[in-house]
Amino acid sequence: MSRAVRDVQNSDFMGRYAEGHPNEGSQVNRYYQGTAKIDAVERTAREEIKRLFRCRQADVRPISGNAANTAIALGYLRGGDPIIVNSTDAGGHISHNTIGTFGRRIQSRGKALTSGKTNSIPLHYFPLTEDRYHTDVAKSIDLIERVSPRMIILGRSLFLFPEPVRELSGVCRDRGIPVL
């Protein structure tokens, strides 16, 4: 392995998360902080790609769970469609949060959606048991019946215990609610 590759592997870029878009001044756009150097590299790369391809927009972030969730959000959901997800406090993916794909980043027909507005995606979070480590299945079923979501999204960035797929998918199937 070359010294250059080792240097990159030993750098801050190998282990630091930089989800979201670069912070701009006092505007915080990242879920994790301490990303000033990554922000600078990403901004430079974005500007270089725009210049190279003579385009107005470019996204240089690596393909990830965010990209997959964006495809679902843009292809399946419309403003006002409620969804039920795991909160980031419960290990849920950042894209399931108000600052992620299903929160403020989703667009509908070219119009940016703003969290809490009529054209946003109303986010509901799976209730947790008292220990805050497990999904409360009974309360989740109640939430599904009450909210009648367009879809539910299981899965997390942090898995400590299995998700209640079997328990919730049956309820959703009976109501025609897709489970992702």
PLM features per residue range, with description:
Residues F13, A18-A67, P122:
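Conserved N-terminal alpha-helix of the aminotransferase class I/II PLP-enzyme fold
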Residues Q57-V60, M151-G155, L180:
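Short catalytic-loop micro-motif centered on adjacent basic/acidic residues
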Residues T70-L74, I94-G100, D136, E163-E167:
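Short acidic, glycine/serine/threonine-rich loops at helix termini
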Residues L160-L180:
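Catalytic PLP-binding core of fold-type I/II PLP enzymes
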Residues R61-P62, V85-T88, G155-R156:
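Glycine-rich, histidine-containing beta strand-loop boundary motifs that form or position
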Residues I99-L154, P162:
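PLP-dependent aminotransferase-class I/II
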Residues L77-H93:
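Conserved PLP-anchoring active-site segment centered on the Schiff-base-forming lysine
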